[in-house]
């Protein structure tokens, strides 16, 4: 017996030492799961519900990520929700961008450092009023591809992308020490016509393969059986979305038909609504949002406020809806934090509601950032687009008997110039037509350097032009943003069908894909010899409605050595019509004061300089207020308040657009700019 004790004591000692260690490891193991017996989430074994807000890192400069996240935390949110736009990270097949403003991993780690959990929505389709719903345009190189389906070509591209993205996300899962508690599969799939369950099952398998079996995967659809019929899938937790205009009881009953047990979740509770060019700015009354949020939280539900901050559609990233209506540069969304990240009345009202249910962090709330009105900056005309083709298209044009689309000439965004000659004399006006509505989306038309007018998708498909036989016919075609929602997201751009002149098909095209980004960035010091402007002068005798599309440039200096400068600002375009604007080579986005409702564009301070003059480059497409008679009118103005809700005036009636079954009703009586607290 003593010998036996001698042999077993070391073993008992080892077990005693290992036992507590193993128990401690189990107690501290991070877990996030669904407790179906208590209709709740469990976070590390304890009942939990999230109060989240949407922020899209792709719409907020990295410079401001921490500021916005801190404000969200101080509002009482314990989580954030964000989309991952595929096209933001893979602009060309196999070419990936994950640095600077594209560094989604840093963004998620920053949220984690600030104590915020994350609801991740990696698509591959996201909607989000984002260009093509986040799907990369290069998918359309196969013209017959059926997006968001089990089409083999689509699945192959998706599989490759998920194989890049999801392994980056796995270390950031809550179970692995990160902030990500749930991951959405696809997005509102029940609103899409395909209803392809093989596609959803494929995604489910790939998400599980890359992320493991422990993470909570979910879907989101409108709170109606019509949407849930094709959007829900066994093995993915079903959630719904709805706004202030919905009956909350009925909405959650819709979820309960798919998920009899488990937490109630509104994945998109709308704090505001989206805008379209040529339609009034959408707002939702603060009282309505606060009241509905109270009712949702009183039911013990988890909720995500969409949006908590909307941000900006910089460059060409805005989407569009059908019938075709493009979204503007501002994605303010009438959210609790303004486009510029400023605190609003709605922010404090919702914070007050949240603190009735959860503890709100103590301490000061980061203030709204200061804004500065830098004033008027005079611009000078550089060159018309036609005169700058050597800069804009250095590789030369493409010849084709019939027009080619943007995709066919390897151009995804921006502009393409289509050129041919008039096959007949048009001394008397002759109809230039797109009989199949094939101008996607706007074409700025000129004959021998004399502007003729604009062809516009759905609105203007015929334009009378004049010119002699053999004259040069130019159409500068703009991609205004691909459709992001519904059945028509395979949105080809350019001249997607033939044009006719007096019913005769035009042929023998010379096509110039324009690299405006490289041209602007590499010519900030100027564009060499400048135009004499004689084309504009000649046109002035015929009409005051249009000038040739042209680039304009100006500079302004910000004093150095002053601690508070530079500051955020807003750029306004008095007298200008429609175009694109860059500051120091940074593409701010589209302006269109002639159509509205947005009149100013947000200019974040980090793109401004005090060490050197700041360069403004404007591409005006329709009419510029510039003439030799009064050069002071050729100017833009920097102001310290945004104007995103002007009265709407436009030259062609727009049809009403409805994104979802029952969008929140816009409130018409709000001030045109958000209050700053």
From Swiss-Prot:
Changing residue 162 to S: In GM1G1; loss of galactosidase activity. Changing residue 597 to S: In GM1G1; 2.1% of wild-type galactosidase activity. Residues 650-677 are annotated as: Disordered. The active site is at 188 (proton donor), 268 (nucleophile). Changing residue 329 to I: In GM1G1; 5.0% of wild-type galactosidase activity. Glycans are attached at residues 26, 247, 464, 498, 542, 545, 555. Detected in placenta (at protein level). Detected in fibroblasts and testis. Changing residue 397 to A: In MPS4B; 24.0% of wild-type galactosidase activity. It comes from the Eukaryota. GO terms for molecular function: beta-galactosidase activity; galactoside binding; protein homodimerization activity. Changing residue 595 to W: Reduction of galactosidase activity. The lineage of its organism: Eukaryota, Metazoa, Chordata, Craniata, Vertebrata. Changing residue 190 to D: In GM1G1; 3.4% of wild-type galactosidase activity. Changing residue 201 to H: In GM1G1 and GM1G2; also in a patient with a slowly progressive GM1-gangliosidosis form; 36.2% of wild-type galactosidase activity. It is an enzyme of class 3 (hydrolase). The gene is GLB1. InterPro entries: B-gal_1-like, BetaGal1-like_ABD1, BetaGal_gal-bd, Galactose-bd-like_sf, Gly_Hdrlase_35_cat, Glyco_hydro_35_CS, Glycoside_Hdrlase_35, Glycoside_hydrolase_SF. This is Beta-galactosidase. Optimum pH is 4.5-5.5. Changing residue 482 to H: In MPS4B and GM1G1; severe decrease in galactosidase activity. The keyword Magnesium does not apply.
């Amino acid at each position: 017996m003593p010998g036996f004790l001698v042999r077993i004591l070391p073993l008992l000692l080892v077990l005693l030492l290992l036992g507590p260690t193993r128990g401690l490891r189990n107690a501290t193991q991070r877990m996030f799961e669904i407790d179906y017996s208590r209709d709740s989430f469990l976070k590390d074994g304890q009942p939990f519900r999230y109060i989240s807000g949407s922020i899209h890192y792709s719409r907020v400069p990295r410079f401001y990520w921490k500021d916005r996240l801190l404000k969200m935390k101080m509002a009482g949110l314990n989580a954030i929700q964000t989309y991952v736009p595929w096209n933001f990270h893979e602009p060309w097949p196999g070419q990936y961008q994950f640095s600077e403003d594209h560094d989604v991993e840093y963004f998620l780690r920053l949220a984690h450092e600030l104590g915020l959990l994350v609801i991740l929505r990696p698509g591959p389709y996201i909607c989000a009023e984002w260009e093509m719903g986040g799907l990369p345009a290069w998918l359309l190189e196969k013209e017959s591809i059926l997006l968001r389906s089990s089409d083999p070509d689509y699945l192959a591209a998706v599989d490759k992308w998920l194989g890049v993205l999801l392994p980056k996300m796995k270390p950031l899962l809550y179970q692995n020490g990160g902030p990500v508690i749930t991951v959405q599969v696809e997005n509102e799939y029940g609103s899409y016509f395909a209803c392809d369950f093989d596609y959803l099952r494929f995604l489910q398998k790939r998400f599980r393969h890359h992320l493991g079996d422990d993470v909570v995967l979910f879907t989101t659809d409108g709170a109606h059986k019509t949407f849930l019929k094709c959007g829900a899938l066994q093995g993915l937790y079903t959630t719904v979305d709805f706004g202030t205009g919905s009956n909350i009881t009925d909405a959650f009953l819709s979820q309960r038909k798919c998920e009899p047990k488990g937490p109630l979740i509104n994945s998109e509770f709308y704090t505001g609504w989206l805008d379209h060019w040529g339609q009034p700015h959408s707002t939702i009354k603060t009282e309505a949002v606060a009241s509905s949020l109270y009712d949702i939280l009183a039911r013990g539900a988890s909720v995500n406020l969409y949006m908590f901050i909307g941000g900006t559609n910089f460059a060409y990233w805005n989407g569009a809806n059908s019938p075709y209506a493009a979204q503007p540069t501002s994605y303010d969304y009438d959210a609790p934090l303004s486009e510029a990240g400023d605190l609003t009345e709605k922010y404090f009202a919702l914070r007050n509601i949240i603190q009735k249910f959860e503890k709100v962090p103590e301490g000061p709330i980061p203030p709204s950032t200061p804004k500065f009105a830098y004033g008027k900056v005079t611009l000078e005309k550089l060159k018309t687009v036609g005169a700058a083709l050597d800069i804009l298209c250095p590789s030369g044009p493409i010849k084709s008997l019939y027009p080619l689309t943007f995709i066919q000439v390897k151009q995804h965004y921006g502009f393409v110039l289509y050129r041919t000659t008039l096959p007949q004399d048009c001394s008397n006006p002759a109809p230039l037509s797109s009989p199949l509505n094939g101008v996607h989306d706007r074409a700025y038309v000129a004959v021998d350097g004399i502007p003729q007018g604009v062809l516009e998708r759905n609105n203007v498909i015929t334009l009378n032009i004049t010119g002699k036989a053999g004259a040069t016919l130019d159409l500068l075609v703009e991609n205004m943003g691909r459709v992001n929602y519904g059945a028509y997201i395979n949105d080809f751009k350019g001249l997607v069908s033939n044009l006719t002149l007096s019913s005769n098909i035009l042929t023998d095209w010379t096509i110039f894909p324009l690299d405006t980004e490289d041209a602007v960035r590499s010519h900030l010091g100027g564009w060499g010899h400048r135009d004499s402007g004689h084309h504009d002068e000649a046109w002035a005798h015929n009409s005051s409605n249009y000038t040739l599309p042209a680039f304009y440039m100006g500079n302004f200096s910000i004093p150095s050595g002053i601690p508070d400068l530079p500051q955020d600002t807003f750029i306004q375009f008095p007298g200008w019509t429609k175009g694109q604007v860059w500051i120091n080579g940074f593409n701010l986005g589209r302006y269109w004061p002639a159509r509205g409702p947005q009149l100013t564009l947000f200019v974040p301070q980090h793109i401004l300089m005090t060490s050197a003059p700041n360069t403004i480059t404007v591409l005006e497409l329709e009419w510029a207020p510039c003439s030799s008679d009064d050069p002071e009118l050729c100017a833009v103005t920097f102001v310290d308040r945004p104007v995103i809700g002007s009265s709407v005036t436009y030259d062609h009636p727009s049809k009403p657009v409805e994104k979802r079954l029952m969008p929140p009703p816009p409130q018409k009586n709000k001030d045109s700019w958000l209050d700053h607290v």
